[in-house]
């Protein structure tokens, strides 16, 4: 631990925290409440080994944000994705898995077909995408602390009134 602390400079993007002994769930809730990206925890007696292990765990924090729906990408045999943009700008920020229940998924497909529109000018061609006109907002769960959407899933959607 001392060697690692010495390798990380004070101007580094990497933050080195002090040891926080205690119950992992309680510590995670404090980290999540503070708006941090997550935590790395390890068994006190374990040594670092490269590759997957249960001795070292990375626990990530998620948040929910509101975005504008640009379109839905659907290909046979693959999961569907909602293509999302910053609200009001139509600037693409990433995609979110469409992992909602069947009723909501069918309502989404219907809404997408009713609001079909051209792709945003800056977007590369995506043949499997049904683009929509501006006006559909969505709530997306995604990793906290990332510029673009990562590990994102669509939670809900509605017409922007």
Protein language model features and the residues they cover:
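Catalytic cores of nucleic-acid ligases and guanylyltransferases
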Residues: 1-161
